[in-house]
Amino acid sequence: MKTSAIDHVVLTVPDVERTVAWWHDELGLEVLRLDEWRRGEALFVSLRVSADTLIDVLAGERTGENVNHIALVVDGVDLDELAASGRFEVEMGPADLFGARGTGRGIYIKDPDGNRVELRTYPS
């Protein structure tokens, strides 16, 4: 397995509208799925950093763990097989999930310090 990119980072924030406005107004990031989020059709709003990287903004109270997870694009691995292998304790998935390049396959695992890491693949 080879890691090739950071797909997205998820921030948990108490005021999504304020956070999205700041990242857009101050840093010029493109806002994605805001209207869908407002209608309850999307769990989070996304901010485009680059063609391949997003910051997702998830509503939630500050708990000291305000970075929800880091998502890494991985190549050369079947996530269904990896999840079944027992190599990692899988917190969620495999599942088809929205990301910087559209829908891909992902699993959530934890690093030794308890940080949530998503391993993500995309169709070729």
Question: Over which residues does each language-model region extend?
Answer:
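N-terminal beta-strand motif that seeds the catalytic metal site of vicinal oxygen chelate
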Residues: 1-18, 67-70
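Vicinal oxygen chelate
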Residues: 16, 70-116, 123
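A short acidic/small-residue loop/turn micro-motif
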Residues: 62, 123-124
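Short acidic/glycine-enriched loop/turn segments that link adjacent beta-strands
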Residues: 38-43, 64-66, 100-105
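Helix-adjacent hinge/juxtasegments
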Residues: 60, 64, 68-73
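Conserved beta-strand in the GNAT
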Residues: 55-58, 118
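Conserved catalytic-core motifs of GNAT/GCN5-like acyltransferases
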Residues: 30-37, 95-98, 124
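Core segments of cupin and vicinal oxygen chelate
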Residues: 11-54
